[in-house]
Curated annotation (Swiss-Prot):
ATP binds at residues 22-23, 64, 67-69, 130-132, 173, 183, 220. GO terms for molecular function: ATP binding; ATP hydrolysis activity; four-way junction DNA binding; four-way junction helicase activity. Mg(2+) binds at residue 68. Residues 184-254 are annotated as: Small ATPAse domain (RuvB-S). Has 3 domains, the large (RuvB-L) and small ATPase (RuvB-S) domains and the C-terminal head (RuvB-H) domain. The head domain binds DNA, while the ATPase domains jointly bind ATP, ADP or are empty depending on the state of the subunit in the translocation cycle. During a single DNA translocation step the structure of each domain remains the same, but their relative positions change. It is an enzyme of class 3 (hydrolase). GO terms for biological process: DNA recombination; DNA repair. InterPro entries: AAA+_ATPase, AAA_lid_4, DNA_helicase_Holl-junc_RuvB, P-loop_NTPase, RuvB-like_N, RuvB_C, WH-like_DNA-bd_sf, WH_DNA-bd_sf. DNA binds at residues 293, 312, 317. Belongs to the RuvB family. This is Holliday junction branch migration complex subunit RuvB. Gene3D superfamilies: 1.10.8.60, P-loop containing nucleotide triphosphate hydrolases (3.40.50.300), Winged helix-like DNA-binding domain superfamily/Winged helix DNA-binding domain (1.10.10.10).
């Protein structure tokens, strides 16, 4: 399957390395998410003044909005070391126990995709989060006994794209729960200009805004599009990313003015032309366009809902009049 240039997931190790090189180090350098930043600034300063670990933090929202970056920034602001892992990587209770017992006082433990932890793993986390202790069972059968190990004060930062899949007991143990929202065009323009400076790429304000406009409210996509448009500027232009060049390059990359690609358009066309605009169930849509249900839920639907192209109802998904207009299809409202 071909790489989607507007996918909000990281594509490969090279892109992970690229993102790491762009990451801000402080909250003041972090662009966007102002409400989240303002609250975290207070919480971090208060914890520092009390010489305590920051409360456990849950960050949730669509992929590519900066959850991992924000976790790194929090650790940096606290002057703490950060250890990173992910839900799928913690397969056995012993895996988590090894990580927890390696923590030093004040460390930050970042668990990406925390919703994918098994219930058995979650149960080990409960006392670790609440009481900074770890209950382990030694032996088996009638001779088995439980031993409690003390852990140093630490901060757990969990990140998820699907907060609804977290169990209530785990969710309730986070003292700080923040939702990361899609970025505005102005914020993404600022991000594109910042990234172009790091990449030593010449770009004008209108060129940056054109890239931002097609970036689906997502910094990861904005940075990826900038890299590709930069290639066109060097090969087919004079090295400077202008509005005209950005439009031409993104059109060739099949990213339309609202940030939709051929897969998004296929989804909308299917709802409109095969199912009379809906409502139609997500499983039916997935089967019709050859995509996984989870891919549509995580990668396509949030943005299409955000820009008003889709509506989610108890009976299924509906394509809106705005979607019809964008695709140039006549909209006839049923009476």
């Amino acid at each position: 399957m071909d790489e989607r240039i507007i996918s909000s997931e990281t594509v490969d190790a090279e892109e992970v390395s690229f993102e790491t090189s762009l990451r801000p180090q402080t909250l003041s350098q972090y662009i966007g998410q102002d409400k989240v930043k303002n609250n975290l600034t207070v919480f971090i300063e208060a914890a520092t003044l009390r010489n305590e670990a920051l409360d456990h933090v849950l960050l949730y929202g669509p992929p590519g909005l900066g959850k991992t970056t924000l976790a790194m920034v929090i650790a940096s602001e606290m002057g703490s070391e950060i250890k990173t892992t992910s839900g799928p990587a913690i397969e056995r209770p012993g895996d988590l126990a090894t990580i927890l017992t390696s923590l030093e006082p004040g460390d930050v433990l970042f668990i990406d995709e925390i919703h994918r932890l098994s219930r058995a793993i979650e149960e080990i986390l409960y006392p670790a989060m609440e009481d900074y202790c770890l209950d382990i069972v030694i032996g088996t059968g009638p001779t088995a006994r439980s031993v409690r190990l003390d852990l140093p004060p630490f901060t757990l930062i969990g990140a998820t794209t699907r907060a609804g899949l977290l169990s209530a007991p785990l969710r309730d143990r986070f003292g700080v729960i923040d939702h990361l929202e899609f970025y505005t065009e102005e914020q993404l323009t600022e991000i594109v200009l910042r990234t172009s400076g790091i990449l030593d790429t010449k770009i004008d304000d209108l060129g940056a805004r054109e890239i931002a406009r097609r970036s689906r409210g997502t910094p990861r996509i904005a940075n990826r599009l900038l890299k590709r448009v930069r290639d066109f500027a060097q090969v087919r232009g004079n090295g400077t990313v202008t509005e005209k060049l950005a439009k031409e390059a993104l059109t060739l990359l099949q990213v339309d003015p609202r940030g939709l690609d051929t897969i998004d358009q296929k989804l909308l066309h299917t709802i409109i032309q095969s199912f009379r605009g809906g409502p139609v169930g997500l499983d039916t849509i997935a089967a019709s366009i050859g995509e996984e249900r989870e891919t549509i839920e995580d990668m396509q639907e949030p943005y299409l809902l955000q820009i008003g192209f889709l509506q989610r109802t108890p009976r299924g998904r509906i394509a809106t009049e705005t979607a019809y207009n964008h695709l140039g299809i006549s909209y006839e409202k049923e009476v």
